Amino acid sequence: MPKKFNETTLSKFQARYGQEIPDNHYPSNQFIEQLLARKSIRRFNNKKIDPKLIEKLLAAAQSAPTSSMLQPWSVISLSEEKRRVLHNQRNSHWLGETKANPDQIRTPTDPGNLRALKECSHFFIWLVDCSILDYVFSDPSLDKKYKDLKIQRERGSRASRELHYELRSIIDTVIAAQTFSLAAESLGLGVMYMGSVRNMDLQEEFSIPNHVMPLFGMCVGYPLSDDLNPFGAGKIDQYEKKPSHIKPRLPQELIYHQDEYKPLDVEKLHEYNSLMESFYSYYELGRDWFYRVIDRTFPLSNSFKKLAAKYGFFTE
C-alpha cells in the first residue's frame, strides 16, 4: 500500500482524503471521529440485533428532519425466508442496463453484496411512501372539514404539484435512512446500503401498494471484523486477504464554495483521480475514479421508468 494510505500514520481527517494534507486540529469528539472512519460493512457475524434496539433506531430515524411534517416514508424488515425471495428477484427481475443497450436486462454478479444480504441480522427495504398522504387527499370523510384547503391544492399543475411532493418524499426517506444508519453505527453495528433494490419489481411479492416505491435496501448487523475489504464485487476472497482502508473522498476545494460557485479546478480533479487509481490498484482492481464515473452514470432506461410508473411515481 502506498504510504499515503497508511492509516497508522494518518489522522482520520487525513485518511478520509487519502494523503498527508495539513490536519485540521479543531477539537473533535467520538461521533465525528467515527464518521470520518466509517466504511460499508459486507461481512457480519451471526449475532442478532435485539428487537428493542431496532425500535430505538427507528425512533432515531423518525427524529430526522421531515419536510412540512409529511413523514412520507416507511420500511420493510425482511425475514431470512423473504431475503431468499429477494435473492431470486435479483436474478429474475434485475432492471440494470448495459451501456451497449440501455433496455437490455442484465444479471448482477456481486457475491459480496449477496453474502451480506444472507449474513446480516436485519435487512430493510426503505420505501418512499406517499400512501398515507394519498388517503388524506382522497378520503371523502375529510372533504367537508378541509374543503377550502383541498380546492387550493387542486389549483395549478397537477404534474408539477405531484413531482414536487414526490421529490420531497424521496429526500425525506434518504434523510431518515441515513439517520438510522448513523445511530446504528454509533452503537457498533455495521451498515451497507444496497441500491439494486431500486431496480427490482417487488410490488406483488411484498404487497406494496400504489404510490409506494422501494428506494434502496440496507444490511444491518454486527460486523464480523473491523478490518474487512471495502469491495463486494469480483474475487472477494482475494480482497479479504488485505486490510480495508478508508476510501478517499474528493478534496474539499472541489466541493466547498464561498458566496459563489467556483470554476472546476481540473488539476485537482486529476490529482484525485490519480490518488484513487493508486487506491484501487492496491486491491488489484485496475481502474481509476474516472472509470467509475463513466461506468456508473449511464442514463435511466425505459425499463426503470416503467417500473417507477408501476409503483405510481413520475406518471405525468
Which residues fall in each region the model found?
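Acidic, surface-exposed loops and disordered segments
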Residues: M1-E316
